[in-house]
Every structure is written in C-alpha cells, then in structure tokens.
UniProtKB/Swiss-Prot annotation:
One of the Pfam families matching this protein, by short name: Pyr_redox_3
Keyword Oxidoreductase: yes
Xref: PANTHER family: FLAVIN-BINDING MONOOXYGENASE-LIKE PROTEIN (AFU_ORTHOLOGUE AFUA_4G09220), FLAVIN-CONTAINING MONOOXYGENASE
GO molecular function: flavin adenine dinucleotide binding; monooxygenase activity
Domain of life of the source: Bacteria
InterPro entries according to UniProt: Auxin_biosynth/cation_transpt (IPR050982), FAD/NAD-bd_sf (IPR036188)
Protein name according to UniProt: Uncharacterized oxidoreductase CzcO-like
C-alpha cells in the first residue's frame, strides 16, 4: 500500500506530535509514523520509578497543558498518557507499528519504505529523537554469565535483579535515580567517568527550571559563546538524594569502568570489585543508517543541519539535543523548534 502526503513525520513521540500539531493547525496533508504499538510507549516502557526532573509546567507540548500541580514533577506514565491524549485531542494522523526501513529522494520527491507500506512525500521531518538504540560498551561481553546485566532501557525495578551487590555504570539522571532506588537494601557502586555536578530541584521554593527560564538559560542557543560552553559540559544530576547517599557511604563511587574479566570489574584507578549485578546507564546512540540520501549525515553519522533544516530541500530534523536551544531535547522545549520548522515548511 502506498500513502501520498505533503509532509511525512518519522517518529511518534513528543517531537513528532509537536510537529503534527503545527502541521494540523496549518491544514497540511501529513502523516506521522511510529514503530511503537501505542503512543507514549517510549515513556511507558521505561523503569517504574522514573520521574521527570522538569516540573509539569515545563513538560507539555503546544496547545495542551499537562494535568496536575504545575509545580509538581510528572511520572513517566503521566507523560505517556499525556502524549496519547494529545494525539487524540488534535486528531493527529498517526500510523503505529510502522518502522522505517529506508528514506530516499528521487526527483524532488521523498520515498519512504516501511514494514507497513510505502510513503511518498514532498517533505520529511525526522523526529526520532536522540534516544534510539541503547549503548553498551563492548567489554560487557566479557562479563560472566553468573552476573546479571541490563541496560537502563530494559530495567524496570529492583525485582529483576538477583540477590547481592550492584554496579551502576554511568551517572546521568537515569543512573542516579536507579542507584538511589537500589541503595535502599543493596550494596551499590556507581561508576562515573567525570566529575559529577549536582543541581537542586528547587531554589527558594521555586523549580530550578523557573530560575533557568528567568535567567534566559533555557533559550541560550548553540551558536552563542555561552551555548558553546554549556553544550560541552556534562549534564548535571538534578536533586539531592544521590549526593546525600554518597556522603553517607550508602552509594560508593568508582571511577570510569575500564575492563571486565569474568565477574571482576576493573576501574581507571586500578581498583577492582566483584558484584552480582551490573546496570548499564551508558546512554543511547542515534542510528540514521536508513537515511539513504547524500550530505545529510557527517562522518560520525550525526545530522548536518541549521536549526533542524538540512541542505537537502524538504528534509528536516526535530528533537535533537541542542537543536538550537538548551531546552531543545526537553518536552517543554521541542515546541519552539517545531514552530520554527513549520515556518520554513510553509515558506518553501
């Protein structure tokens, strides 16, 4: 089956839905394709205790606020249900269970092959986001079968793990939240390859994101000197729990994980430990190998763009970290980038 649209949006999570909102507002013939079974599954399938560090007032898309206390912090299930409700409210044409196999361009027309039919479009917005495939270091293969290992993308709760100690490798906010959760009744090690920075969730009774907004930090753009500086820094850990547990000795910090042999894990300071469980909080990587169009990706496989606009006429990206602003990859920030793209789409 072949679908013909003016604009095809690839990705049906927050970036794709924000783009869909503006396309719908402008009466453009479009479709959104997503590989999930249900809208919001990207969030719904994350670990049970996941809570966003952005307050509800900064965790919604254009045209529809997130329900609940605006100063409270939403759970992952709230966000999943919100995205589903959002798509229904604006009657966005979404085709689920549809995974893109290839994107090509022939004679000014984009041709998209999927597992569920083909699409022809004048313009394409790639809104798959940065969290596509879990990254696990190659030396994980050397870990003994007796040690249970799981990436954060497949971790749900402590009951998955076997009895005994845990090493969490990677100290982003997911790794921090999981380490805190596990420290209640386990010996927990946290392997960190950089100096951790801790930001409180609130200052003087207001969310730190209220202060970020007040100071203009959320709108700092990548082309500014401040933006260049911030973008090169590691992300801070939001909240005080991890810091307190480290100080109390309930979570033991180890430097970068260097190698594994059986059940012995070695670190950058030459220390070694043996644990019964390893959680890889080592992040994700983007896979755009299905984009079969020249001059779209750089030598690292990353999109080449200016504010999401590529040099290939009609091809756009949305939902990238630092796409233009500090908040571009956050739910509350993606709408501004979608609005910028709709103006470019309408003018070309």
């Amino acid at each position: 089956m072949q679908h013909i649209v003016d604009v095809l949006v690839i990705g049906a999570s927050q970036a794709g839905l924000a783009m869909g909102y503006y396309l719908k507002q402008n009466n453009i013939l479009f479709a959104i394709v997503g590989k999930e079974n249900r809208i919001g599954d990207v969030w719904r399938n994350r670990y049970d205790s996941l809570v966003l560090f952005t307050p509800r007032w900064f965790s919604s898309l254009p045209g529809m606020a997130l329900k609940g206390d605006p100063n409270g912090y939403p759970t992952k299930d709230e966000i999943a249900d919100y995205l589903e409700d959002y798509a229904q409210k604006f009657e966005l044409p979404i085709h689920l269970n549809t995974e893109v196999i290839s994107l090509q361009k022939e004679d000014e027309i984009f041709k998209v092959t999927t597992n569920n039919g083909n699409y022809v479009a004048e313009k394409v917005v790639v809104a798959t986001g940065p969290f596509q495939k879990p990254y696990i270091p190659p030396f994980a293969e050397s870990l003994s079968d007796k040690v249970y290992q799981v990436h954060t993308s497949r971790y749900l709760n402590p009951s998955q793990l076997q009895e005994g100690s845990v090493l969490v490798v990677g100290a982003g906010n997911s790794g921090a939240q999981i380490a805190v959760e596990l420290s209640e009744d386990r010996e927990v090690y946290l392997s960190v390859g950089h100096k951790m920075k801790f930001f409180p969730l609130e200052i003087m009774g207001k969310s730190i994101f209220w202060w970020f907004k007040k100071l203009g930090l959320l709108n700092v753009h990548i082309n500014s000197s401040l933006g260049q500086f911030i973008s090169k820094q590691s992300d801070p850990i939001f909240g005080k729990e991890l810091k307190h547990l480290i100080q109390e000795g309930k979570i033991k910090i180890k430097p970068r994980t260097e190698s594994i042999l059986g059940d012995v894990i070695s670190f950058a300071d030459n220390s070694q430990i043996q644990v019964q469980n390893v959680i890889w909080a080592t992040g994700f990587y983007s896979d755009y190998s299905w984009i079969q169009i020249p001059n779209v990706l750089d030598h690292r496989g990353k999109p080449i763009h200016q504010r999401g606009v590529t040099s290939v006429k009609g091809l756009y990206f949305l939902g990238l970290p630092w796409q233009y602003r500090r908040g571009s990859a956050l739910i509350g920030g993606v709408g501004a980038d979608a609005e910028y793209l709709i103006n470019d789409i309408l003018n070309h």
